[in-house]
UniProtKB/Swiss-Prot annotation:
Alpha-D-mannose 1-phosphate binds at R25, R129, R140, R147, S185, D187. Its EC number is 5.4.2.8. GO terms for cellular component: cytosol. This is Phosphomannomutase. One of its GO terms (biological process) is cellular response to hypoxia. Mg(2+) 2 binds at Y228, D230, T233. Involved in the synthesis of the GDP-mannose and dolichol-phosphate-mannose required for a number of critical mannosyl transfer reactions. Required for maintaining N-linked glycoprotein glycosylation at the neuromuscular junction (NMJ) synaptomatrix, and thus acts in multiple pathways that prevent NMJ structural overgrowth, restrict synaptic bouton differentiation, and limit NMJ neurotransmission strength, in order to maintain viability, coordinate movement, and in adults ensure correct wing positioning. It is an enzyme of class 5 (isomerase). The active site is at D16 (nucleophile), D18 (proton donor/acceptor). CDD domains: HAD_PMM.
């Protein structure tokens, strides 16, 4: 049986946000929204799984209406689980690691960043979330132009890659995973708390015949890698919403 022949409740389509439903840190276009909600949603169960918190998902996907449009929303790699617009579960990194370890990590990162020489620095260098910490060497309060500039700088100088290497050495005694996502930051979370975490919730409550995942950061070290390479998913590497639309049109025969 082809994917297109499956009933809506037999297939789940899971999507990353940046580079998949939107361009990086941009808002979804009206054209893509129209295609997605009018043609894809009637054909398949739909969900989003992102590293960002729910508020950032609201910003990029045109507000709180996604609570009604998506069957599943998994912010913070699925450490927060939302079904039918209601939160049904949440995990907490402080309870898992302990306050002393979290404090030690944050203190080290702040010292490290204070001595790091990058072209610009702005504000919000560490963002604390339920299931992870997000570290941004230039600060998340940068403009879009500054974000793009750092992304190019990082390709050449590998700022994030080098910092992760140093953190792995310093915190070898702590069960932490480091994952580069987006243009300017990286996520830090306990082992196994990557995007595959959402599959635990899905498998515990549902029996889909196929689970498809769409994402862009699918290389080792990228924040889509674990779920992209998981045998439970049929995965599709994309780089833009146009790629996503093209593949959806093909597999659902729209």
């Amino acid at each position: 049986m082809t994917t297109a022949a499956l009933k809506r409740d037999e297939i789940l389509l899971l999507f990353d946000v940046d580079g998949t439903l939107t361009m990086p840190r941009s808002v979804v276009t009206p054209e893509f929204e129209e295609f997605f909600y009018s043609r894809v949603k009637p054909r398949a169960t739909i969900g989003i799984v992102g590293g960002s918190d729910l508020e950032k998902m609201f910003e990029q996907l045109n507000g709180r209406k996604i609570l009604n449009e998506f069957d599943f929303i998994f912010p913070e790699n699925g450490l927060v689980q939302i079904e039918g617009g209601k939160e049904v579960g949440k995990q907490n990194i402080i309870m898992h690691l302990g306050e002393e370890t979290v404090k030690r990590f944050i203190n080290f990162v702040l010292r490290y960043l204070s001595e790091l020489d990058v072209p610009i620095k702005r504000g919000t260098f560490i963002e604390f979330r339920n299931g992870m910490m997000n570290v941004c060497p230039i600060g998340r309060q940068c403009t879009r132009e500054e974000r793009n500039m750092f992304a190019e700088y990082d390709i050449e100088h590998k700022v994030r890659e080098k910092m992760i290497k140093d953190l792995k050495q310093e915190f070898a005694d702590v069960d932490l995973t480091y994952s580069i996502g987006g243009q300017i930051s990286f996520d830090v979370f306990p082992h196994g708390w990557d995007k595959t975490y959402c599959l635990r919730h899905i498998e515990a409550h549902y029996k889909f015949k196929e689970i498809h995942f769409f994402g862009d950061k699918t290389e080792p070290g990228g924040n889509d890698y674990e779920i992209y390479s998981d045998p439970r998913t049929i995965s599709h590497r994309v780089y833009t919403p146009k790629d996503t639309q093209r593949i959806l049109t093909e597999i659902l025969e729209l």
